[in-house]
């Protein structure tokens, strides 16, 4: 009997405790004002000052700089991939060649003639 009344008490108090916790958590957020160093969101745009404009400009500039850097890195990776891919295709063509004097030189990534040492196109 005692456990039943304790369970009823906990069931009744739990929603009230949750509401109080949510209210206590939101109170500082609602009381905070837009000061320097805090994050402020405006809906109508009437609170646009010089600092927020400068911060937005710097953020955009940083994004553009990192975007440019990412593009350079991606271009370099693509070039390296294309170079390796072309070398693999050339090696396969050289190995499948009907020319018995053709061999693949891995250091230079070229198909060479065994007798003359010159590059050949199989």
Curated annotation (Swiss-Prot):
It comes from Serratia proteamaculans (strain 568). Residues 1-31 form the signal peptide. Residues 46-71 are annotated as: Disordered. Keywords: Signal. It comes from the Bacteria. NCBIfam families: PRK13659.1. Belongs to the UPF0482 family. The lineage of its organism: Bacteria, Pseudomonadati, Pseudomonadota, Gammaproteobacteria, Enterobacterales. The keyword Nucleus does not apply. Disulfide bonds: none annotated. InterPro entries: DUF1283. The keyword tRNA processing does not apply. This is UPF0482 protein Spro_2288.
């Amino acid at each position: 009997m005692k456990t039943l009344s304790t369970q009823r008490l906990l069931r009744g108090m739990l929603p009230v405790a949750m509401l109080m916790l949510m209210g206590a958590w939101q109170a500082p957020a609602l009381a905070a004002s837009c000061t320097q160093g805090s994050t402020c969101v405006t809906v109508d745009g009437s609170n646009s000052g010089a600092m927020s404009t400068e911060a937005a400009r710097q953020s955009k500039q940083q994004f553009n700089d990192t975007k440019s850097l990412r593009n350079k890195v991606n271009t370099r990776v693509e070039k390296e991939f294309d170079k390796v891919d072309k070398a693999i295709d050339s090696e396969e063509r050289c190995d499948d060649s009907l020319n018995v004097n053709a061999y693949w030189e891995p250091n230079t990534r070229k198909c060479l003639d065994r007798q003359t040492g010159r590059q050949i196109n199989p």
